[in-house]
Amino acid sequence: MDPQQELFSYLLVELKKLYPDNVYDTFLPPDNTPYPFIYVGNSQLIDDANKSAVFWNVYQIIHVFHNNPKQRGTVSKMLLDIKKVSRELNHTTNFAWSLKNVSQDIMPDTSTSIPLLHGVLSLEFKFN
């Protein structure tokens, strides 16, 4: 399996264990979906080759959306849970993983008719 897909699948399965019925992928959920929810977004695989070896990084973006901007603590806790799942990852079926960097943003989101709170995690994993 492609390493990027293997990481994506692992995160999706583990997050669904923590938040059943609140984790989505591929497309954002329909308009009537209850908040808060997690959206496992885009991922990127980068090869870094030198003369004798290839090193790889996978970057994974995960979003948390909430329709109550006053409940920032809920978004923050969900982001923390996602980071814990990411840090606990050591191995998948075919690869050994290490979480290298995490960037976290929480911001207002006015892309819908109701104001949202939008949390974004950018996760950088190394694997071999």
Task: Write out the residue ranges for each language-model feature.
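Small/polar-rich, solvent-exposed N-terminal microdomains that initiate assembly or binding
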Residues: 1-47, 52, 80, 84, ...
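Short, charged interaction patches at domain edges and termini
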Residues: 1-10, 45-55, 95-128
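Exposed loop/turn and edge beta-strand positions of beta-sandwich/beta-sheet ligand-binding modules
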Residues: 34, 58, 117
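Active-site-adjacent structural patch at catalytic or cofactor/ligand-binding sites
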Residues: 58-65
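Short, conserved charged micro-motifs
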Residues: 69-76
